[in-house]
Amino acid sequence: MDYYRKYAAIILITLSVFLHILHSLPDGEFTAEECPECKLKENKYFSRLGSPIYQCMGCCFSRAYPTPLRSQKTMLVPKNVTSESTCCVAKAYTKATVMGNIRVENHTECHCSTCYHHKF
């Protein structure tokens, strides 16, 4: 009888550890090592029944390469590495009012283009 209690306890502990690990994994958004492609995704915070709000999400490319010597000579502060990247941004959008008086952009089309947050 004591043997079965130990066996049951081990099974329950193993099951609880497995469920804890399973529960701690993300909900499938970024489970792959690679980032998903740039596309529209519903914004669950601003969306309401019958009036979904979409935003562009995903990854585009970025790369770094050695700066050509002739380009380094023209720089005020020469840098050995030049980087280039694009971000997932809205190609087209409409203005929408949510929660009474908050104006947001409801993205309708996405593409990879200049990263706007770098332009401040």
From Swiss-Prot:
One of its GO terms (molecular function) is follicle-stimulating hormone activity. It is found in: Secreted. Keywords: Disulfide bond, Glycoprotein, Hormone, Secreted, Signal. InterPro entries: Cystine-knot_cytokine (IPR029034), Glyco_hormone (IPR000476). The keyword Metal-binding does not apply. It comes from the Eukaryota. The keyword Transit peptide does not apply. Transmembrane segments: none annotated. GO terms for biological process: G protein-coupled receptor signaling pathway; positive regulation of steroid biosynthetic process; regulation of signaling receptor activity; thyroid hormone generation. Heterodimer. The active hormones thyrotropin, lutropin, follitropin and choriogonadotropin are heterodimers composed of CGA, a common alpha chain described here and a unique beta chain which confers their biological specificity to the hormones: TSHB for thyrotropin, LHB for lutropin, FSHB for follitropin and choriogonadotropin subunit beta/CGB for choriogonadotropin. This is Glycoprotein hormones alpha chain. It comes from Callithrix jacchus (White-tufted-ear marmoset). The gene is CGA.
